[in-house]
Curated annotation (Swiss-Prot):
Keywords: Cell membrane, Membrane, Transmembrane, Transmembrane helix. It comes from Vibrio cholerae serotype O1 (strain ATCC 39315 / El Tor Inaba N16961). HAMAP family: UPF0114. InterPro entries: UPF0114, UPF0114_bac. This is UPF0114 protein VC_0208. The keyword Lyase does not apply.
Length: 162
């Protein structure tokens, strides 16, 4: 009975595989949104104000960072929790593939969240005349929370490895 339960528990990790596959669909949706922004920008490129162009650029950078975060979670999550990715050794193989354990993934995810939050906060600061000051304070507080959390997780990781 114990062996059966253990086999079932171990096999249940495959339930995560469709979730990681679903993240690739989310990545596709992000790519579509990215190019939608580009196509909206191009007809107005000669008339758009510099501040608005920078805001669009920051939005596109934000999408790019989120996409990278999705790729990182998708690949390393699959490798850590489901099965080893059997990708042939080639020039285009990701250097970190197979090397991210859950602890380093957690640190990279928190660093990515801080970077995404920083970009978002920069967009807010560039558009302060259209945003209420209370909202700006909340954005700033949330960003500080992300930064402190990332440092705390890194510190806890460091002291647990000693």
């Amino acid at each position: 009975m114990e062996r059966l339960i253990e086999k079932l528990l171990y096999s249940s990790r495959w339930i995560m595989a469709p979730i990681y596959l679903g993240l690739s669909l989310l990545l596709l949706a992000l790519g579509i949104k990215f190019f939608q922004e580009i196509f909206h920008l191009l007809p107005n490129i000669f008339t758009i104000k510099e501040v608005d162009l920078i805001l669009v650029a920051l939005s596109l950078i934000d999408v790019s960072l989120v996409g990278g975060l999705i790729v990182m979670v998708m690949f390393s999550g699959y490798e850590n929790f489901v099965s080893k990715l059997d990708v042939d050794e080639s020039e285009d193989k990701l250097g970190w593939l197979g090397k991210l354990d859950t602890s380093s993934l957690k640190n990279k995810v928190s660093a990515s969240i801080v970077a995404i939050s920083s970009i978002h906060l920069l967009k807010v600061f560039m558009n302060t005349e259209n945003i209420e000051s209370d909202k700006i304070k909340w954005y700033l507080l949330l960003h500080i929370t992300f930064v402190v959390s990332a440092f705390a997780m890194g510190y806890l990781d460091k002291i647990t490895k000693k």
